[in-house]
A protein has these predicted regions:
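Bacterial N-terminal signal peptides that target proteins for export
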Residues: 2-12
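Surface-exposed short loop/turn segments
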Residues: 26-42, 108-158
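C-terminal motif of bacterial Sec signal peptides marking the signal peptidase cleavage site
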Residues: 19-22
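Short secondary-structure boundary motifs at beta->alpha junctions and helix caps
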Residues: 78-88, 158-198, 205
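Sec-exported extracytoplasmic/periplasmic mature domains
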Residues: 102, 106-110, 197-205
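A structural "domain/chain start" motif
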Residues: 24-95, 204-206
Length: 206
């Protein structure tokens, strides 16, 4: 009879230890990032007239088909890709870039590029095929990094290739972490959209 209080105290102590242990090992919640709302165009507008542009979905390699936030340590092993454990993009990178292109151009009344929805493709317009080949954060050392994306753009008309180019943009981060990488990637993507528009304006009309 006298041992019951001792056993009860032992049981409560064990339960408390398990509770504290469970709290200590609880997984950190994931943080998700996108590019935020479209921004108004700044700087000098690109003056040119273009036919309607059909933009299918952007393609990407298998390594970019998930929503993992990738980075490389150039000072350690630049051939190895890493992924942040507790940070994710809100959607795969190719979808993020496609959405940004459409929202940025639609938000800019001075943009010469008139995108056509996939379901309403204009056979007389241009076909713009984009392949996302890089979308990563690069660390030059433990405290400095930059975001980089690269697109291969192919311009077609009536299934004939008119022009092709590779566009690359980088933006430095203000901190060596995932949130700063996401912010820098947005800056780099917006700059690349400007480059893409300029490249399209240089192409002769079919």
């Amino acid at each position: 009879m006298k041992t019951r209080p001792f056993i009860s105290r032992l049981t409560l102590s064990a339960a408390a230890t398990l509770f504290v242990s469970a709290c200590a090992t609880a997984p950190t919640p994931l943080s998700y990032f996108d590019f935020g709302p479209a921004t108004k165009a700044s700087g000098t507008a690109i003056a040119c007239e273009l036919p309607p542009v059909n933009l299918p979905d952007i393609s990407s390699p298998n390594s970019l088909e998930s929503n993992l936030m990738l980075y490389r340590l150039l000072y350690a092993n630049d051939q190895q890709t890493h992924a942040y454990a507790n940070h994710r993009w809100s959607m795969p990178p190719a979808q993020l870039v496609a959405l940004r292109i459409k929202s940025q151009l639609a938000n800019d009344p001075k943009s010469p590029v008139r995108l056509v929805d996939n379901g309403l493709a204009n056979p007389d317009g241009w076909q713009l095929r984009l392949d996302l080949t890089d979308f990563s954060q690069y660390f030059s050392d433990a405290t400095h990094s930059y975001a980089q994306l690269q697109l291969r753009a192919s311009l077609l008309h009536a299934n004939n290739l008119l022009a092709q180019t590779t566009l690359t943009q980088q933006a430095n981060t203000d901190a060596p972490d995932a949130p700063a990488g996401a912010q820098a990637m947005r800056v780099a993507t917006d700059a690349l959209i400007t480059d893409l528009t300029g490249w399209l304006c240089k192409q002769p009309h079919p």
